[in-house]
Swiss-Prot record:
GO CC aspect terms: plasma membrane
Domain of life where this protein originates: Eukaryota
Topology of this chain in the membrane: Single-pass membrane protein
One BP annotation, GO: regulation of cell migration
SMART domains: TSP1
Record-level Gene Ontology MF annotations: signaling receptor activity
Purpose of the protein: Required for determination of left/right asymmetry in nervous system. Acts together with unc-40 to control an initial left-right asymmetric polarization of the Q neuroblasts. Mig-21 and unc-40 may control the asymmetry in Wnt signaling response by restricting posterior polarization to one of the 2 Q neuroblasts. Involved in left-side QL posterior migration. In right-side QR, unc-40 and mig-21 pathways mutually inhibit each other in posterior migration, allowing anterior QR migration.
Subcellular compartments: Membrane
Post-translational modification, as annotated: Glycosylated via C-mannosylation by dpy-19 at Trp-58 and Trp-61.
Official protein name in the record: Abnormal cell migration protein 21
Residue intervals passing through the bilayer: 240-260
A Pfam match: TSP_1
Main location class: membrane
Amino acid sequence: MERDSNTAKSEIFYSNPAIWRHLKDGKGEGMSKSEKRNKHGCRNFTYSIWNCIRPGGWSTWSKWSKCREGIRKRRRTCNNPLPIGTTCSGQKVEKQSCAISSNVPEYLFGSWTSWNPWSRCDCDRSLRIRTRHCKGNSCEGCDKDYEDCRPDECPISKKWSEWTDWVNYGIEQVRFSAWCSSSNVANTEVGIRKETQDSMKHANWSEWHMHPGVAYRYRLLHNSSISIEHHLLSRFTSSCLPLHFAIPIFCFCILTGFLLQNIIYCVVNRFKRRFIRLNYSYDSNPRDYPSHLIRSPGSPKDESFW
């Protein structure tokens, strides 16, 4: 099978029986061609894919670029001819040191001016500043520089914050305020001040506390002439029990009294009956017995009394 030779630009290999030789006719890129003859002398051509390797070549160097930042450049391309299966050896870009001509406008390449003098100290920030300007297109670096003020450049100032709201703490109220004293950021002091005043309300009564023989409760009072500075704790004791203690005790007393009354009644009746039985004896004359102790003949025997 033959390949179209119009697209071929590489070398091909031609062989006379078993002998290969190079043909530079520009046909059969990447192909190999062999020729053999049979015993009758007839020619026979065969084609096969051949891994052809061809080194490439460099084009001519381009012109030098303009000098920028002390360097200029030029380039070349690996296409003369194009390599097959390999690359061109050597550098693609060449650099060379150069000097900027004095007639090149300065604005094309930026440069800094010298630093301006330091400004006066900004006591609010405790800093001072100096500046410089870029002449040209662009410059690397900062256009501002800062440093701390000296301790003697700013007067010492003290500032207070607003007071907080009053907060109740028992018999007194408290509020706070913060202050800051500074001459510069390296020498700063911070503090808190506190202010108190008497509360105009009595505290609520506490719960009842029970001890042997006494029940008491207490509350914190608004300070009087005796306890204005000391905030003395005043306790109030009550001679009456609270209702939730009095009701159970009252019920217990009623139940105990009822039981004691029945017990005493039974004991008294018991002794009374025995006393009557011991003081009366039986004799032949029924008239000597009380009428309620005389049992008529035939009456049922009831000895519950005895």
